[in-house]
Amino acid sequence: MTINQDSFTKEELLACSRGELFGPGNSQLPAPNMLMMDRIVKISEEDGEHGKGVIIAELDITPDLWFFDCHFPGDPVMPGCLGLDAMWQLVGFFLGWCGGPGKGRALGVGEVKFSGQILPTAKKVTYKIDMKRVIKRKLFMGIGDGEVSVDGRVIYQAKDLKVGLFQDTSNF
């Protein structure tokens, strides 16, 4: 099922987390609290630095977000692994949006660099994935480069984010 839409609201992302957007058994986003975005502001198969597609999403930051209470008490900061997971979530969403069948699983990342942090005083996180390759064979797989920005400043960069869609995940 291909979706002819170039942006998605929070309600639509929640529908995706329930398996309602791309059809049963296909790509899903995680439910809150692990859903790491509030909206997708752009998704395209043609754009991006490599001409293979781009997806841009945003997360509104408020001091009451769950991870600030536990990471770290007295020194609240969003865990970097959540930003990395958000980028994998977006690659999987891109594959489902392209009509790929199966359930998404992160397969790896080539390189990750952290050069900043997300504090409770921040306003907005922006995720951007530039797709490098989409393989549409027995295994539907996407490879992309990503970045995480906080209030307009790039603070994480990831190269070669890999996500695959699988018909059967029982032996994964």
From Swiss-Prot:
**Pfam families cross-referenced by the UniProt entry:** FabA
Q: Which InterPro entries match?
A: FabA, FabA_FabZ, HotDog_dom_sf
Q: Where in the cell is it found?
A: Cytoplasm
> Looking at the keywords, is Lipid metabolism present?
yes
Ordered alphabetically, the record's keywords are: Cytoplasm, Fatty acid biosynthesis, Fatty acid metabolism, Isomerase, Lipid biosynthesis, Lipid metabolism, Lyase
An annotated GO cellular component: cytoplasm
Q: Which Gene3D superfamilies is this protein grouped with?
A: Hotdog Thioesterase
Question: Taking the first listed entry, what is the main subcellular location of this protein, grouped into a coarse class?
Answer: cytoplasm
The reaction(s) catalysed by this protein are: a (3R)-hydroxyacyl-[ACP] = a (2E)-enoyl-[ACP] + H2O; (3R)-hydroxydecanoyl-[ACP] = (2E)-decenoyl-[ACP] + H2O; (2E)-decenoyl-[ACP] = (3Z)-decenoyl-[ACP]
Keyword Ubl conjugation in the entry? The reply is: no
| Quaternary structure, from the entry | Homodimer.
Q: Give the family from UniProt.
A: Belongs to the thioester dehydratase family. FabA subfamily.
Q: What protein is this chain from?
A: 3-hydroxydecanoyl-[acyl-carrier-protein] dehydratase
